[in-house]
Amino acid sequence: MQENSCEYLKHCGSCTLDMPYSEQIDFKKNFIKEHFKDFHNGEIIFFRSPISKFRSRAEFGLYHDDNSLSYTMRRADGGYLKIDKCSIVDEKISVIMPVLLDLLKENQNLKAKLFGVEFITTRDEILIILLYHKDASTIIQELTWLQSKLKVGLIARSKGKKLVFGSSSLNEKLFINGKSYHYVFGDAAFIQPNRNINENMISWVLDHTTDCKDLLELYCGHGNFTIPLSFKFNKVLATEISKASINSALKNCELNGVDNIKFTRLSAEELMEAFLFKRDFRRLQDIDLRSYEFSHILVDPPRAGCDKSVLDFIRNYENIIYISCNPLTLKENLKLLCKTHSVDKFAIFDQFVHTNHIECAVVLKKY
């Protein structure tokens, strides 16, 4: 296996693990085994990632030097490092990075007060977001020209404004267990940044979801897990606080021929109030909570994990699927969850190769 040969490795603050990939795997496995030995002594599956060209979303700073312009990353020791390529980004990003930079250098108005660039890719598409310290509406003509040259979706953001040239949404296709799933989402959506690992995560969850009746999902986003799981359950109730994500999720149901999911824009705390019949919500007026027979609950919380009230709520369910982007908060949450449940399955997903980041998933079953 070819190791990370990036010329910026020892200086860039993004890839912090300067070691062969086999050693990175051992490091992460040992970390998890040590920290979770009180909760699980069974098998822990490790899902490897490609070690290059795996990241589908990336953001770079920009360094201005007279008439020159360079991409930057934060240095490991502070400050900024000028770069002209990045080995971990999707191939489509690698190809368009120098093209975009050359076009920006041609036009003083386009590059003035431009401080960052974000790239988002799917399997077949790419979207570019330019970040300005000025009112981008003053350079609409130049941005229109730039989009015509790039022939991809282009967004300019500045001081609360968002200008769109072409499309601001992306179409994705995932292949999981011999079946394809279609998604659409906007530029502000939370997406899994490693497509290969995302497919493995969904596949693993599907493989370890059995004896299914109805599913309750918290933090569902645009339906990344919801859509594939809907084919295993009678009915699904999924919650999310972002209106844009809910709209994308509804569209994704149409794209995949799914009609057994109800999406509702509620926070986890509001959902608990609804289930305890402490409060009525207009957003639930067409949903009969008593009609569901939930056999599983899936949570994919932010890095802070679930607070005690949410943990007390999800402990009511026979089967818990917990996706975690922070093993330390997962460990804290398991201290309470394992009073009523045991960890049945445990997996590590290497979303961010060459970093300390560890993504985990556990399946818990009630005693």
From Swiss-Prot:
First-tier enzyme category under EC: transferase
Active-site residue list: 325 (nucleophile), 359 (proton acceptor)
One annotated GO biological process: methylation
SUPFAM superfamilies, A to Z: S-adenosyl-L-methionine-dependent methyltransferases
A Pfam family the protein falls into: tRNA_U5-meth_tr
Keyword terms, alphabetized: Methyltransferase, S-adenosyl-L-methionine, Transferase, tRNA processing
InterPro entries according to UniProt: MeTrfase_TrmA_AS, SAM-dependent_MTases_sf, TrmA_MeTrfase, U5_MeTrfase_fam
EC number: 2.1.1.-, 2.1.1.35
GO CC terms: cytosol
GO molecular function, one term: rRNA binding
Binding site residues for S-adenosyl-L-methionine: 192, 219, 224, 240, 300
Catalytic activity as recorded in UniProt: uridine(54) in tRNA + S-adenosyl-L-methionine = 5-methyluridine(54) in tRNA + S-adenosyl-L-homocysteine + H(+); uridine(341) in tmRNA + S-adenosyl-L-methionine = 5-methyluridine(341) in tmRNA + S-adenosyl-L-homocysteine + H(+)
Function: Dual-specificity methyltransferase that catalyzes the formation of 5-methyluridine at position 54 (m5U54) in all tRNAs, and that of position 341 (m5U341) in tmRNA (transfer-mRNA).
The family this protein is said to belong to: Belongs to the class I-like SAM-binding methyltransferase superfamily. RNA M5U methyltransferase family. TrmA subfamily.
Record's protein name: tRNA/tmRNA (uracil-C(5))-methyltransferase
UniProt source species: Campylobacter fetus subsp. fetus (strain 82-40)
